[in-house]
């Protein structure tokens, strides 16, 4: 249920930088993206994907036309919706379909979605996990972890978005369970631990408890106050910048403490970016 063995894609396609505007995406690149044959390489390409069309092509390739006729009819209601509404909607339809299958078939089909060559398809798999009411928070975090460490930027973003509502609903438990993630050897996992609990976040609902009491997350933040990876540093500084909108003095105090405890170039960069909104 993946790449066709006779499909040839030139190497330069995989090395492309990507168009700056959707209108500048070459037709052959757009066609390969829409067929699920290649990954997007930047946000412009990622946002240009027609997920409903991609769903139809993928399921047709997998011989699932009969099983998805009704789903395609329901997708007509998604016309004009933003991508951050469409991806969860497709994830939910996959979840409903998977739940009707025997266990072995369900596992094999989910694996095909989760390991698909298209980053957009893997995004659906993340929401299949996040929307699954049969999984508790611990199980969702366990299953979402590979997506949080995916090599593709889009899948990593969708990964934390897919479980953010579950994290917010059981915040204290989530903060405890994410502590080991904040010291994980993989910077992508450390970044997930911070990004998933940002008080305001991007394209996500605010977590009111953390806006009002950001100190709840201090054990995780302290663990990455001098992280060597800019990807993690940016997440930490953005987290504190979020908090500065409602608790500016707390952010100033944390940054002052960190500067005293860890006067490294990494901490200094985090502190500088964290206080960018403070006067």
Give short role names for the model-derived ranges.
Residues 1-279:
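Surface-facing alpha-helical segments and adjacent helix-coil boundary elements at the starts of domains
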């Amino acid at each position: 249920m993946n790449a066709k063995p006779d499909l040839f894609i030139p190497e330069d396609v995989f090395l492309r930088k990507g168009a700056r505007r959707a209108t500048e995406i070459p037709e052959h690149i757009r066609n390969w993206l829409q067929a699920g044959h290649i990954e997007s390489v930047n946000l412009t390409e990622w946002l240009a994907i027609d997920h409903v069309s991609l769903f139809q092509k993928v399921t047709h390739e997998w011989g699932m036309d009969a099983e998805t006729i009704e789903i395609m009819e329901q997708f007509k209601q998604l016309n004009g919706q933003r991508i951050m509404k469409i991806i969860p909607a497709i994830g939910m339809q996959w979840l409903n379909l998977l739940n009707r299958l025997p266990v072995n078939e369900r596992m094999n089909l989910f694996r095909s979605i989760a390991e698909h060559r298209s980053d957009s398809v893997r995004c659906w798999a993340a929401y299949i996990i996040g929307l699954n009411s049969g999984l508790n928070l611990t199980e969702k975090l366990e299953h979402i972890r590979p997506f949080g460490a995916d090599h593709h930027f889009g899948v990593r973003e969708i990964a934390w978005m897919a479980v953010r509502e579950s994290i917010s609903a059981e915040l204290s438990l989530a903060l405890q369970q994410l502590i080991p993630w904040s010291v994980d050897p993989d910077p992508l996992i450390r970044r997930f631990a911070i990004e998933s609990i940002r008080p305001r976040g991007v394209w996500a609902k605010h977590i009111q408890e953390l806006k009002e009491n950001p100190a709840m997350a201090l054990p995780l933040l302290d663990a990455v106050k001098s992280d060597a990876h800019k990807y993690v540093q940016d997440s930490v500084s953005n987290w504190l910048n979020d908090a500065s909108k409602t608790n500016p003095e707390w952010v100033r105090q944390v940054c002052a403490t960190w500067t005293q405890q860890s006067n490294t170039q990494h901490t200094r960069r985090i502190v500088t970016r964290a206080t960018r909104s403070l006067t």
